[in-house]
Amino acid sequence: MGRIRILPDQVANKIAAGEVVERPASVVKELLENSLDAGATEVRVEVEAGGRRLIRIVDDGFGMLRDDALLAFERHATSKLRDVKDLLSIATLGFRGEALPSIASVSRLLLETRSMEEPTGTRIEIAGGKMLRCEEAALGGGTVITVRDLFYNVPARRKFLRTEPTELAHIASLVTHYSLAHPDKSFRLSTGPTELLGVTPVASMKERVYQVFGSQILDELVEIGVRERDLFLPPPSVPPSQAIAEYRSTEPEDPPFRRFRLTGFFSRPQIQKSNRNSIYIFVNGRLIRDRLVLHALSSAYHNLMPASAYPFALLFLECDAEEVDVNVHPSKTEVRFRHGSFLHDFIRDSIRERLMESRPAPTFSPVPMAAPPAQQGAQLPYSEFSQMLENEQQAASEMAEPAIAGEPAMPEFNLRATAPPTPRLDFSAPPIEVAPGPPPSGKLSRRLDMHGEFPLEAIPAPEMSLSALSDLRPLGQIHESFIIAAGRDGLWIIDQHVAHERILFEQVLKQRAAGRVETQRLLMPMILQLSAEQQIDYARIADELHASGFETEPFGNRTIAVKAAPAAVGPQDLERILFEILEIAENEMRTNSLDDLRRNICASIACRAAIKINMRLDLAKMEWLLRALAATDCPMSCPHGRPIAMHYSTREILKAFHRI
């Protein structure tokens, strides 16, 4: 007897389910696409325990006949394809006929459906790929699919599922994607009694963006409008110039070109995200993740945004179905474009042109030669540093004991503009040629000869220990951004922003560990509107926010009220830092590291509260900054890994001047 045998259908379905059903969000995706293909105008998604215990999809589509409902659980049974030619022009979201049998093989599935062509509906129950019952039922029009105990018979796959909030966030992201792609339909997502997303049909994409993300995000976006570009496709046997001339003269019914159409929204360069989770890409209404489109988007922001940052973007591409191959992977999120190079340039150019059109016109104001007496006390634009210092001074005066023991006392900081800003150096000016002077006198020559060589024994050995920072003596600033300091061995250049960021980071960490984070109450609560994913992240990290000095509470559907914040955070930065922390929480959900989340929250607070570049400091402030930096545990890098100081030893300086 031969060794090769055909696998039973139950085993084959479980193998296929490994590609189609990766996690609960995969089940929601397949069933949601079936609902949209069925012409549903209202889709409701209900989940429990992150989709492990329950996933229910309810739609008002045209439903299925009894025979179709039974046949739908057979492998590769579909109503969307007839022959191989149909693969070249797929217009539906689903087409492979693998979703229902794959889902039914790894769960307990209940299908309830009724077509308006039949007087009664059909109820089918399947567990682990085995049909338990099939009966008639009194049902309304549409389809309800209930999936329970996902992966109950595949323990290995169930073991590798993430936490419930993580799986729920993936489901929320998926439903959010499809609600954006179909603004003319109603979507609802709920987990238990909590509704995470609820949108009604609207007339425009702009209204749907407002429903999903709120006015705060919408105000930061730029609408692309309608961008179109035609790709001319002459017959292979006809030269392009001749084909164009024939087309213009005859205007055939089937023109030899393909039209690409791009609409959507994108953020301005100053709105930066730390990951690609805020990039939504759709092709003919289908959610995709494509490297070609992502590269075109990043190319549009070239030199406008750091390479490590990503924009917020909603891109909707429409093209001929023959221009895109969606039959690449069972998940159908990976596609291939027939003319990828043309599409890449079209997307890049469209976004780049719109970016240039939407940029604000520059304004110039004359720089006063001297500050009038009435403006001597005008506060600098970057006032969060002085505000933070004033808060710390006030809190320190009210407390009987110091906030953190062992830290250097903070001086009386009050950053005020006392003189006009120092003109920036202009390196674009041509060099000044200096005419050669008379040769040095004999006396000067003898002095040069005598000091031309520096004795090596007089050069101290380089001391790279961190204790050398405590002996630094500030000399001044470069561009009011970098502190120049002299030490026992050479010269130091310190980035004042990242140095202060390191100091505040360790202060916030220690205050948080001691349970004594200084907070300030807001005069009026700040109301923030969250997306469905952000609402899940907020519920997961609400306790961490409270421990870090933020007093927040739910305030209606997908909104929170902020009543207090850490004293180091200025009111103007509060909204941005909270959204930044929620974005950090979304990233940390993949690692499930609570300690990393806490450190990243403290790092965000420190970064926003630290002094900025282009801020003048007097010597007293510089001295305090250097002393406080030397007292930190890691004074050579900021919490995000950037270097704080550069060191040029005496030996390196002498060697550069050819003294040794």
From Swiss-Prot:
Q: Which Pfam families match?
A: DNA_mis_repair, HATPase_c_3, MutL_C
**GO CC, one annotated term:** mismatch repair complex
Disulfide pairs here are: none
Q: Does the keyword DNA repair apply?
A: yes
Keyword DNA damage among record annotations = yes
Database matches in InterPro entries: DNA_mismatch_repair_CS, DNA_mismatch_repair_MutL, DNA_mismatch_S5_2-like, HATPase_C_sf, MutL/Mlh/PMS, MutL/Mlh/Pms-like, MutL_C, MutL_C_dimsub
GO BP: mismatch repair
Q: Which UniProt keywords apply?
A: DNA damage, DNA repair
The parts of the chain that form a coiled coil are: none
Q: Which domain of life is it from?
A: Bacteria
The record's GO molecular-function terms, alphabetically, read: ATP binding; ATP hydrolysis activity; ATP-dependent DNA damage sensor activity; mismatched DNA binding
Q: Which CDD domains match?
A: HATPase_MutL-MLH-PMS-like, MutL_Trans
Role noted for this protein: This protein is involved in the repair of mismatches in DNA. It is required for dam-dependent methyl-directed DNA mismatch repair. May act as a 'molecular matchmaker', a protein that promotes the formation of a stable complex between two or more DNA-binding proteins in an ATP-dependent manner without itself being part of a final effector complex.
Family note: Belongs to the DNA mismatch repair MutL/HexB family.
Q: Which HAMAP family match?
A: DNA_mis_repair
Q: What is this protein called?
A: DNA mismatch repair protein MutL
**What is the source species?**
Solibacter usitatus (strain Ellin6076)
Gene symbol? mutL
